[in-house]
């Protein structure tokens, strides 16, 4: 476990100016894939939380306390995510920023629920992350979990899938759609949401298949899609397998439009897929780096040599929201903090004002389309 635990990443509490006494410290857990194939996303969560804590502490901390961070590496693995969650419990952590993957967030959040902890995910979009608070959800959550204290800063799969379906239909590509997923709660959840949105408008997918995370050879799948003469390949999954799939489509001469969701929002997608990623379509909220509220923070990141793409600023915002909710509660008690979040807001964040509904979802989710294009000497995603 120690190899997955970032002890050195904790921020050291400062000294009170009066008498140079040590300030009381409130430790927040940050969980994500800091190693492994999705480490680029883990770095986004880590850097965002670190910068937010630095700025919050510089402004006086929270209720006289300085914030500190402790990191748990879940390697995008559900079992490891549960281990990280249990480690947080053992360390007395009561608040968590994370996890990244829906498939890790869901089981880890059960540990947090059982131990009265509050968590905010910057990125997990599966609907059951929050919906199960109010009632049964999907195949695995048969009962409501009213004591769940789980929030997110991002939108949901059903919202993202609706945008994708509208585009496919509006562009006249709906007669030959292949929906492919990676069998994870995120990937299959997103694929199913898109498929359902298409079906709600009378469109049936020509193909619907799942692959396994870690697969590298998709030649048989590509051949099958060529035979079906698909015009659009909708991918529910992350950048690793997505990059390999789009590259092998190009290698085999399949010219179908490749489309996916927020799981490929990393320059690693282009590193893996190469020139074949040009023309890929992707759904993600409007680029947070271009928000006026983020201008100064983006400059700080860029000065440090880090590009705050994708979920970096979402992690920053999650930390801001947590700090503001603790302040509103008057103490660092998870239940009292949650009461300041459910149905409450707005919270002033780097993403703009954010409010929550009674489930822990944000009230203003918005997804737009991006196209992967060559900009200068690199291929990256550009908002349409």
Regions found by a protein language model. Give the residues of each.
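Extracytosolic ligand-binding ectodomains
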Residues: 2-9, 23-384
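Hydrophobic helical h-region of N-terminal Sec-dependent signal peptides
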Residues: 10-17
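Sec/Tat signal peptide C-region and signal peptidase I cleavage site
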Residues: 17-23
């Amino acid at each position: 476990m120690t190899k997955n635990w970032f002890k050195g990443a904790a921020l050291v509490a400062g000294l009170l100016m009066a008498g140079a006494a040590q300030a009381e410290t409130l430790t927040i857990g940050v969980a994500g894939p800091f190693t492994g194939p999705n480490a680029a996303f883990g770095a986004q969560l880590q850097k965002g939380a670190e910068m937010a804590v630095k700025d919050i502490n510089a402004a006086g901390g929270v209720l006289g306390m300085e914030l500190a961070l402790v990191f748990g590496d879940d390697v995008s693995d559900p079992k490891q995510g549960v281990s990280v969650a249990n480690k947080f419990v053992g360390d007395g952590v009561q608040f968590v920023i994370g996890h990244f993957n829906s498939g890790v967030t869901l089981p880890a959040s059960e540990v947090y629920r059982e131990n009265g902890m509050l968590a905010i995910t910057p990125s997990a979009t599966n609907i059951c992350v929050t919906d199960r608070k109010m009632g049964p959800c999907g195949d695995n959550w048969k009962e409501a979990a009213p004591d769940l204290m789980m929030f997110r800063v991002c939108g949901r799969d059903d919202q993202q899938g609706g945008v994708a379906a509208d585009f496919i239909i509006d562009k006249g590509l709906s007669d030959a759609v292949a929906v492919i997923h990676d069998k994870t709660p995120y990937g299959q959840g997103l694929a199913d949401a898109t498929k359902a949105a298409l079906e709600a408008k009378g469109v049936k997918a020509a193909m619907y298949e799942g692959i396994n995370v870690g697969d590298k050879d998709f030649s048989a799948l590509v051949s099958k899609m060529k035979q079906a003469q698909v015009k659009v390949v909708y991918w529910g999954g992350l950048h690793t397998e997505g990059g390999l799939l789009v590259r092998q489509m190009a290698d085999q001469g399949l010219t179908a439009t490749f489309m996916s969701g927020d799981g490929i929002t990393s320059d690693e997608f282009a590193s893996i897929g190469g020139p074949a990623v040009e023309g890929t379509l992707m759904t993600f909220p409007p680029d947070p780096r271009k928000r006026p509220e983020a201008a100064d923070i983006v400059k700080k990141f860029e000065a440090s040599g880090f590009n705050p793409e994708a979920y970096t600023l979402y992690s920053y915002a999650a930390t801001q929201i947590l700090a503001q909710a603790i302040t509103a509660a008057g103490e660092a008690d998870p239940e009292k903090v949650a009461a300041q979040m459910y149905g409450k807001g707005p919270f002033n964040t780097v993403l703009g004002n954010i409010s929550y509904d009674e489930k822990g979802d944000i009230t203003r989710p918005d997804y737009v389309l991006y196209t992967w294009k060559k900009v200068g000497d690199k291929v990256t995603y550009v908002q349409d």
